[in-house]
């Protein structure tokens, strides 16, 4: 008897034809909106800056920790990279611009089981606006990236 597998979230480094090939084997989803993680640091960057001491809290990040507040890194061009708390009191550095594919119909023809909208730093009203934009295929209203969906990785 064959069991159903839950959908796997595909790598954002895959191009559309590669996604189409994988979905033939397993149910698949892809992130079609959101800030993608660039790296996870071994240490909490906010702790290094503010000196928050959470050793008594263990590996989980408490709700009131300074790293739960909006923090970012800024590069020399002024781009801001949001910092999200990660398990083990690490930091997940997000891309400065979200992936935006609402106005690109190609992802709808890859055979994906689901399309994931990855909300990380957005306010609730902004999440609703983005959801509606994806329903209508609207272009982005701010800075965005297409990720690697069209370029891929060598």
Task: Place the predicted regions along the sequence by residue.
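Active-site pocket-lining/capping segments in soluble small-molecule metabolic enzymes
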Residues: 1-154
